[in-house]
């Protein structure tokens, strides 16, 4: 494969350089807040901040691997890996720290903890499946691919900016929070607050965390959408095209 990094900007390296500080800020912010809340204020567990540090280390290691393995290639697959790692670090802050750490580690009765955990996992999984089906429909049932994959000099080129524009044109984005889900979540929030007050002596410190968890879930689902979209368009799809045509897909734009 021709190394187009000499003639064009190295999009993989540029994206890695932008992603590393973003990953560190998001994951270490979550780790620092976790330490203050769960290790210091509540004194319940050191695992929340350890998880944040672990996320920072794993994400940075993944970015460095992509840099070492794919620099100079402008491979869309590598670009997708970087975008997915950055998206996951954002999901960690709102989904893992904001929601799941609360229901896993904050003092609360089991009747509150387990529905929150199981419901959160189920909602994330369900939403990922909804987004996957929607994105696959856009790829398989619209002219999207013909618009964004261009052959230039025997190479397949995917323009990121054009791809985003065309995807928004053909894709019908599912509503992250349908009306019934909004009513359900914001309707049960007062119930959880009342239940915590009745059954827990730590309501004062937990109430703010509960509101953060409830308000953070829609943002977490947004990053689930972005992660699934990036994975399909920039990781799975390039590999599928490479298998079918025998050519890698390169990134431009």
State where each predicted segment sits.
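Charge-rich cytosolic interhelical loops and cytosolic tails of multi-pass membrane proteins
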Residues: 1, 87, 111-179
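N-terminal first transmembrane alpha-helix
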Residues: 1-122, 205-216
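Cytosolic/matrix-facing juxtamembrane and C-terminal tails of multi-pass cellular membrane proteins
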Residues: 1-18, 155-174, 225-253
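Juxtamembrane/interface segments at transmembrane-helix termini
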Residues: 70-74, 125-147, 223-249
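C-terminal transmembrane-bundle signature of multipass membrane proteins
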Residues: 175-253
